[in-house]
Amino acid sequence: MGHRKLASPRRGSAGLRPRKRSSELLPTPRTWPQINSPNPKLLGFVGYKVGMSHVFMIDDWPNSPTNGKEIYMPVTVLEVPPIIPLALRAYAVDGKGEPNVITEYWSPSSLQFLDITRRIRSFSSFLKNDESKKKFEEKFGSKLDLIKSNLDRIVYFRLLVATQPRKIPSLGKKVPDLVEIQIGGGEKKAQLDYALNVLGKEISIKDVFKEGQLIDVVGVTKGKGFAGVIKRYSVVELPRWHKHRKGSRKIGTRGPSLGTPSYTPQPGQLGFHRRTEYNKRIIKIGDDPKEINPAGGFVRYGIVRNTYILLEGSILGSKKRPIFLREAVRPSYVFENAPKITYVNLLSKQG
């Protein structure tokens, strides 16, 4: 029945399988872009989703019918307090031709970030006295020498950074989120010097991204629980007449009796999937929360108290969920400047 492929194509995307729950709440990107920059920089950042609002802005997309005119634009608000790099990981190619971690170097200044003991309990033993801190330096001091001696073998560097949820009272948590962020731009020696310089120091989102550029968003979607085939795959509901008395919100058949094909729609987990959305434009990066906080705060979140960004359109995930922001791997356009915003909605979102 090849003719049925035109009138009734298969339901559900095979590119999104398996439709299972994500193994981690803050996923790390599986690929990183190659940037042409003489100076090293981080290729990503972490923020927390606040909610949505809308602005009026001057359309600056080239060849757009509304270019130069004021347009309405829905935006997503993310709160992005500074992140703190704690460790440096060096990757080199192994015998199988795949890059793997050869060692990692923890800076002594990382012990000043006391919340790390909430995530890594074993580090609490290094905070007892000065003697224990010296043991920490002796343990990881040789790691840095190993990195410098194998600099020609290293493929790339990544920084293990921690977020600061303590600065966001709306989240109601103190345990930091740890994630790896790759360093791009410059030569290997310059990347190593950059990493050693920023270890233990706060990095702002303005050091990574700028207004107007396109970025990718990596995160976990909203969880919907167990769902049937109608909602999960959008298959056509069967007619509700006497010959379909066994049910309508189901598929007609699962196939031959030799085993159900993997492509046959079946009920199961819906939502809480790891997904990547490409080319989300940064409309604005602001330091004054009064410019974005609506009357009464954001529903189910509260008010923004730190640096924030506005992303064009909607993004995945629920409110208060950590979202990974990455340099665009395939930007559709490179903007020179940020768009001009003429109005930001500050009316109450509580109805």
From Swiss-Prot:
MF GO annotations: rRNA binding; structural constituent of ribosome
PANTHER family the UniProt entry points to: 60S RIBOSOMAL PROTEIN L3-RELATED, LARGE RIBOSOMAL SUBUNIT PROTEIN UL3
Keyword annotations of the record: Ribonucleoprotein, Ribosomal protein, RNA-binding, rRNA-binding
Biological-process GO terms, alphabetical: translation
Segments of this protein annotated with the region Disordered: 1-31, 246-271
Family: Belongs to the universal ribosomal protein uL3 family.
Signal peptide segment: none
One Pfam family of this chain: Ribosomal_L3
Function in brief: One of the primary rRNA binding proteins, it binds directly near the 3'-end of the 23S rRNA, where it nucleates assembly of the 50S subunit.
Subunit: Part of the 50S ribosomal subunit. Forms a cluster with proteins L14 and L24e.
Superkingdom, natural source: Archaea
Protein name: Large ribosomal subunit protein uL3
Keyword Flavoprotein: no
UniProt-listed Gene3D superfamilies: 3.30.1430.10, Ribosomal protein L3, domain 3 (4.10.960.10), Translation factors (2.40.30.10)
Recorded GO CC terms: cytosolic large ribosomal subunit
Disulfide bond entries: none
This protein's record includes keyword rRNA-binding: yes
